[in-house]
């Protein structure tokens, strides 16, 4: 959750946009995207597993956001139906394998984002983005540290979730 707001900003997600994602999962990113694109936008969400997609759909229905999302059940190796997305968030195990398909789905100047748990994935994805002509590529990690709010003992809390993943962003250029 600490990463989602930053992802939306870095990918320029705004009302009225056509945004894609692959790797729907429980739908937490889908919910954030659907909220950000507003009533006039559309999220197209690809997932490979029916039970996972069903869970995400239920979560969006509970929040009244399901009408903003087109759910598609498909192995993304086959590519995507769309070719004019403003942005694409890829949350799959080997994102570097799907960069050509993502590139084909994005409009020129379209934003790309992904989350990667390991350095190995970062390296492979960077190489793939370079190979397929993405620009303005950035990699970062967000660290959130909470503090005890006792005025007499202001200090960091005893525990902290440090690493959720590396975030990577880029833009499709011609």
Regions found by a protein language model. Name each.
Residues 9-14, 36, 80:
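Glycine-rich helix-loop-beta junction characteristic of Rossmann-like nucleotide cofactor-binding loops
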Residues 16-25:
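Conserved class I S-adenosyl-L-methionine
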Residues 26-39:
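Conserved SAM-binding loop of SAM-dependent methyltransferases across substrates and taxa
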Residues 37-38, 65, 106-110:
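Helix-to-beta-strand junctions that scaffold the AdoMet/dcAdoMet cofactor pocket
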Residues 40-44:
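Short beta-strand element of Class I
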Residues 46-95:
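S-adenosyl-L-methionine
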Residues 96-166:
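C-terminal substrate-binding/active-site "lid" region of AdoMet-derived donor-dependent transferases
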Residues 170-174:
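C-terminal lobe and adjacent flexible extensions of AdoMet/dcAdoMet transferase-like proteins
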